[in-house]
From Swiss-Prot:
A GO biological-process term: translation
Quaternary structure note: Part of the 50S ribosomal subunit.
GO MF annotation, one: structural constituent of ribosome
Protein name (Swiss-Prot/TrEMBL): Large ribosomal subunit protein uL24
Family: Belongs to the universal ribosomal protein uL24 family.
Function as written in the Swiss-Prot or TrEMBL entry: One of two assembly initiator proteins, it binds directly to the 5'-end of the 23S rRNA, where it nucleates assembly of the 50S subunit. One of the proteins that surrounds the polypeptide exit tunnel on the outside of the subunit.
Keyword field: Ribonucleoprotein, Ribosomal protein, RNA-binding, rRNA-binding
GO annotation, cellular component aspect: ribonucleoprotein complex; ribosome
PANTHER family found in the cross-reference section: MITOCHONDRIAL RIBOSOMAL PROTEIN L24
Protein source organism: Phocaeicola vulgatus (strain ATCC 8482 / DSM 1447 / JCM 5826 / CCUG 4940 / NBRC 14291 / NCTC 11154)
Region (Disordered): 73-92
Lineage: Bacteria, Pseudomonadati, Bacteroidota, Bacteroidia, Bacteroidales
SUPFAM superfamilies tied to this protein: Translation proteins SH3-like domain (SSF50104)
Length: 107
């Protein structure tokens, strides 16, 4: 599998599927599956038994994983979806991610 360009905490745009056009923050990246959990995206209803956290149990809405190919990173400069590139940093030791549309470095 190729390198994933999305990391936890990034703001992403959904480019296909039921939630197309929405944006959200990445909560978790599932590297082996090539999927990510995004805040408020791909919500599913899940039945839960009563427990200490939820004494009544019942139906709970929560995020389900969405495939990385359906996500684009949001450019920090323009606020629009963009592709991501990697280039050497100024010290020459590490790589940094950058937005292909604006050239802006992604923190």
């Amino acid at each position: 599998m190729s390198k994933l360009h999305i990391k936890k905490g990034d703001t992403v745009y959904v480019n296909s599927g039921e939630d197309k056009g929405k944006t959200g923050r990445v909560l978790k990246v599932l590297v082996k599956e090539g999927r990510a959990l995004v805040e408020g995206i791909n919500m599913v209803s899940k039945s839960t038994k009563p427990n200490a956290k939820n004494p009544q149990g019942g139906i709970v809405k929560q995020e389900a994983a969405i495939h990385i190919s359906n996500l684009n990173l949001v450019d920090p400069k323009t606020g629009k979806p963009t592709r991501v590139g990697r280039r050497e940093s100024s010290d020459g030791r590490t790589f940094v991610r950058y937005a292909k549309k604006s050239g802006e470095e992604i923190k």
